[in-house]
């Protein structure tokens, strides 16, 4: 009976307080909050936070130093000022630049020699283009409906442009003649183009108006003679023999009405018997006859001639 001592009953709530809870860190409330059920509005806020946060540990977004840009500072005071010389020259066209250069050389003559030695030598193509521009201006000023021989009215209309072209021819031609021009091919090429321009000069009903045209033919003929003589001294005139200048000069002489006959005679004397048959007045019956020089080059010289047999 002693062993069966009745133990007083213990209330259940005493057992709950008697349990020892483990030590909890300061992050336990955060963990408990993360284990609770999430609401829909909480998910949206978390996505925004994650997207806005920059991944500092991601290797794809390595921060790079930006280059230092030196921004041009604006001027504190804006005021008008003239253009610099390089900018001013950029705005000038060819005619304006030529006028400025001529005015400066006239005021300071010592600069003229400097410009002449600094500027490049004019080429045949550029010079002939200048002459063609003068020729085009002359032709466009001729009244419409004019025939082959123009009237005095047309002459008064175009005489200023005619004089400009003749003066340009007279100035440019000596530049391409020896001894100023040492290459014979350059001189001949210029004379060929300049003679074509003279062929295009208008003809006038009044004879005195044709004096300028006749004088141009006379000057260009003397230039041909000078260049032919100089070419004959170099290499036995090989430039004249293989350049076809005998045919070209013969055609120019025919177009001019025989005004270049002196040049034709000089070329005939320079070439001798090798090119004589291609020149007018040297026994050639027509323009289709092949010259002796061409026959020698092609190997057909002497074909069709009787061969003499027996003692000479």
Swiss-Prot record:
Residues 1-83 are annotated as: Disordered. GO terms for biological process: nuclear protein quality control by the ubiquitin-proteasome system; proteasome localization; protein transport. It is found in: Cytoplasm; Nucleus. Gene3D superfamilies: Tethering factor for nuclear proteasome Cut8/Sts1. The keyword Disulfide bond does not apply. GO terms for molecular function: proteasome binding. The keyword Nucleus applies. This is Tethering factor for nuclear proteasome sts1.
């Amino acid at each position: 009976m002693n062993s069966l001592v009745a133990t007083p009953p213990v209330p259940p709530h005493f057992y709950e307080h008697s349990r020892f809870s483990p030590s909890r860190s300061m992050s336990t409330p955060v963990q408990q909050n993360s284990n609770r059920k999430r609401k829909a509005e909480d998910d949206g806020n978390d996505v925004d936070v994650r997207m806005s946060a920059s991944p500092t540990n991601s290797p794809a977004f390595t921060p790079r130093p930006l280059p230092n840009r030196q921004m041009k500072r604006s001027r504190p005071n804006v005021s008008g000022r003239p253009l610099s010389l390089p900018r001013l020259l950029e705005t000038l066209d060819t005619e304006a630049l030529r006028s400025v250069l001529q005015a400066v050389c006239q005021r300071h003559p010592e600069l003229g020699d400097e410009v002449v030695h600094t500027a490049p030598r004019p080429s045949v193509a550029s010079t002939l283009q200048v002459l063609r521009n003068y020729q085009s201006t002359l032709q466009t000023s001729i009244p419409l409906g004019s025939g082959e021989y123009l009237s005095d009215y047309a002459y008064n209309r175009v005489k200023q442009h005619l004089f400009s072209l003749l003066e340009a021819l007279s100035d440019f031609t000596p530049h391409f003649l020896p001894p100023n021009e040492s290459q014979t091919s350059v001189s001949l090429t210029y004379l060929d183009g300049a003679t074509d321009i003279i062929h295009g000069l208008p003809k006038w009903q009044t004879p005195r108006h044709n004096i300028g045209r006749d004088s141009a033919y006379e000057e260009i003929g003397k230039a041909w003679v000078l260049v032919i003589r100089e070419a004959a001294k170099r290499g036995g005139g090989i430039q004249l023999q293989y350049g076809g200048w005998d045919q070209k000069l013969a055609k120019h002489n025919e177009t001019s009405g025989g005004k270049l006959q002196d040049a034709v005679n000089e070329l005939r004397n320079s070439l001798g018997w090798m090119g004589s048959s291609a020149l007018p007045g040297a026994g050639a019956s027509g323009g289709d006859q092949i010259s002796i020089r061409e026959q020698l080059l092609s190997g057909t010289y002497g074909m069709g001639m009787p061969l003499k047999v027996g003692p000479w």
